[in-house]
C-alpha cells in the first residue's frame, strides 16, 4: 500500500520548525497511513532584518510565501505562529 503524503509549508525559524514538527507527529500518530513531510521556506520577512516590518508589508510578509506554496501546489497545508499572522478588524 502506498502511503499518503501530506506536505506542510513552514518557515525555517526554530519556533516554526518546532510547531510544524509537532503537527507532523500528531498527524502521523492519528493517521498511520499518512506520511507528513515538512517544506521549510525562507520568507521575505525573515530576509529583511534591517527594515521595520511596517515599512515593507507588515506581518503578512511571513505568511505570503507559504500561502503561495499552497496555491502553487508545493504544499498541502501551512503551519503558522499566530504572532506572524496579520490581524484585520
Swiss-Prot record:
Keywords tagged on the record: Porphyrin biosynthesis, Transferase
Cofactor: dipyrromethane
Reactions catalysed: 4 porphobilinogen + H2O = hydroxymethylbilane + 4 NH4(+)
EC numbers, comma separated: 2.5.1.61
Domain of life: Bacteria
Keyword Transferase: yes
Gene3D superfamilies: Periplasmic binding protein-like II (3.40.190.10)
InterPro entries from the UniProt entry: HemC, Porphobilin_deaminase_N
Pathway annotation: Porphyrin-containing compound metabolism; protoporphyrin-IX biosynthesis; coproporphyrinogen-III from 5-aminolevulinate: step 2/4
Protein family membership: Belongs to the HMBS family.
Miscellaneous note of the record: The porphobilinogen subunits are added to the dipyrromethane group.
Protein name, entry field: Porphobilinogen deaminase
Organism annotation: Dickeya chrysanthemi
Amino acid at each position: 500500500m502506498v502511503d499518503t503524503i501530506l506536505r506542510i509549508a513552514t518557515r525555517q525559524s526554530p519556533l516554526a520548525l518546532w510547531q510544524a514538527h509537532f503537527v507532523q507527529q500528531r498527524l502521523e500518530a492519528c493517521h498511520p497511513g499518512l506520511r507528513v513531510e515538512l517544506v521549510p521556506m525562507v520568507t521575505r520577512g525573515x530576509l529583511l532584518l534591517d527594515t521595520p516590518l511596517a515599512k515593507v508589508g507588515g506581518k503578512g510578509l511571513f505568511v505570503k510565501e507559504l500561502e503561495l506554496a499552497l496555491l502553487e501546489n508545493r504544499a498541502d497545508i501551512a503551519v503558522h505562529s499566530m504572532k506572524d499572522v496579520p490581524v484585520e478588524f
